[in-house]
Curated annotation (Swiss-Prot):
GO terms for cellular component: cytoplasm. Its cofactor is FMN. Heterotetramer of 2 PyrK and 2 PyrD type B subunits. Catalyzes the conversion of dihydroorotate to orotate with NAD(+) as electron acceptor. This is Dihydroorotate dehydrogenase B (NAD(+)), catalytic subunit. The active site is at C129. Its EC number is 1.3.1.14. It comes from Petrotoga mobilis (strain DSM 10674 / SJ95). Keywords: Cytoplasm, Flavoprotein, FMN, NAD, Oxidoreductase, Pyrimidine biosynthesis. It catalyses: (S)-dihydroorotate + NAD(+) = orotate + NADH + H(+).
């Protein structure tokens, strides 16, 4: 009898597969493909204190081995999310994780205070956002800046707190250790990689913001290495992200030390990706005679 359950910061997931933020909307869009209750968890579209219309111009661009995106955190804002989207999510039998972004520490804090009053299961702090009070540098680049935002959020956060790390961190292990010391209950890594694409006919960058976030299979070996390194350095659960397209990728992340995985780009290519990965993990465990994920977690 196999058991795919995992417990992260006191929250039980029926399996280790989580739909990644920004790739699954608020879940409704995928109901025609499979029951959302099949998921271990669902991370919401990135939420900000106020509504955001997102970026102008090109938002998605395919590249070899991946996808580049510049959505600009388009979302209805925390209040509208709580009123219009959360009731549906709460009706689904899966772990709901609110992904929160901000341009100032106060924005993060106020958003989390609002979510404290809801039935959200966990909060995932996206620290890849530009810090307007530090000249636009990402909260997730320097450990000291990240530690500050996590510390302030931890003071008010009444939910289990996941911090989502950026691959742009000066030192990913130091960043992870700083966030855990500041109060993170778990870490998810990594976010998209800053990347550039140029239209040589127009002689200009494809995206209006010049750079965009790169995701997909091309980033997996680097993201996998980061998960491995961080898992050896901290004692909180790790959620692996980056280029997970099938169950084999998910198993690799677990063997590298991840407790769970988030599936992102694969959802754009195959709306059934999460469901198929869940089934693939179960079949793999059965075939290999493995009873629990703990038996293979971090074996590398």
């Amino acid at each position: 009898m196999i058991d795919t359950k995992v417990n992260i910061a006191g929250v039980e997931f029926k399996n280790p597969v989580i739909a990644a933020s920004g790739t699954f909307g608020f879940g409704r869009e995928f109901l025609e493909y499979f029951p959302i209750s099949k998921l271990g968890g669902l991370a919401t579209k990135g939420l900000t204190l106020r509504e955001r219309e997102g970026n102008k111009g090109v938002r998605i661009h395919e590249t070899i081995g991946g996808i580049m995106n510049s959505i600009g955190l388009q979302n209805p804002g925390i209040d509208a999310f709580i009123e219009e989207e959360l009731p549906f999510l709460n009706s689904q039998d899966t772990v709901i994780i609110a992904n929160v972004s901000g341009n100032t520490i106060d924005e993060y804090v106020i958003s989390v205070e609002k979510l404290n009053q809801t039935d959200i299961d966990m909060i995932e702090l996206n620290i890849s956002c530009p810090n307007v009070k530090e000249g636009g540098i990402s909260f997730g680049t320097k450990a000291e800046i990240a530690s500050n935002v996590v510390t302030q959020v931890r003071k008010v956060c009444q939910k289990p707190l996941i911090v989502k790390l950026s691959p742009s961190a000066e030192n990913i292990v130091e960043m992870a250790e700083s966030c855990v010391e500041a109060g993170a209950d778990a870490l998810s890594l990594v976010n998209t990689f800053p990347a550039l694409a140029i239209d040589i006919s127009k002689k200009k960058a494809i995206f209006d913001n010049i750079t965009a976030g790169l995701s997909g299979p091309c980033i997996k070996p680097i993201a996998l290495r980061m998960v491995y390194e961080v898992s050896k350095a901290v004692d909180v659960p790790i959620i692996g992200i980056g280029g997970i397209m099938d169950y084999r990728d998910a198993i690799e992340y677990i063997m590298a030390g991840a407790w769970a995985v988030q599936v992102g780009t694969a959802n754009f290519i195959n709306p059934n990706a999460c469901a198929e990965i869940i089934e693939g993990i179960e079949e793999y465990l059965q075939k290999e005679g493995i009873s629990t994920l703990e038996e293979i977690r971090g074996i590398i």
